[in-house]
Amino acid sequence: MILGIGSDLIDIRRVAKVIERHGDRFLDRVFTPAERAKAQRRAANEKMVVATYAKRFAAKEACAKALGTGIRHGVWWRDMGVVNLPGGRPTMQLTGGAKARLESMTPPGHEARIDLSITDDWPLAQAFVIISADPPGRP
């Protein structure tokens, strides 16, 4: 069963301006160490670095919308991180207030699942998040 859906569209140039203005202060406040490491692996191409951050920013916004909280009510930027499953598919890893919110909205006996789609096409980055609850024994 679907528990929440969120989407976000962001202008990559806007993220570039924020990074230029606030630098590490912004990056430390919003992104997990794993997300920062992923972006820095693309350091040879500045546009790819900024697009990587923009996609993850959009994913966090979309996830917060799917949780029904936005970035408030105990859900903070770094409580949500984009990670890749072994096959490469992206998903969200939640901690802190975001994890607590997910647990509170998941029906007893069900397992929460977060599906994430992220993409970019200069100058836009986009993310969709679907949070669902699977009954026991469902793959």
UniProtKB/Swiss-Prot annotation:
The lineage of its organism: Bacteria, Pseudomonadati, Pseudomonadota, Alphaproteobacteria, Hyphomicrobiales. Its main location: cytoplasm. Its cofactor is Mg(2+). Gene3D superfamilies: 4'-phosphopantetheinyl transferase domain. This is Holo-[acyl-carrier-protein] synthase. It comes from the Bacteria. It comes from Rhodopseudomonas palustris (strain BisA53). Keywords: Cytoplasm, Fatty acid biosynthesis, Fatty acid metabolism, Lipid biosynthesis, Lipid metabolism, Magnesium, Metal-binding, Transferase. Transfers the 4'-phosphopantetheine moiety from coenzyme A to a Ser of acyl-carrier-protein.
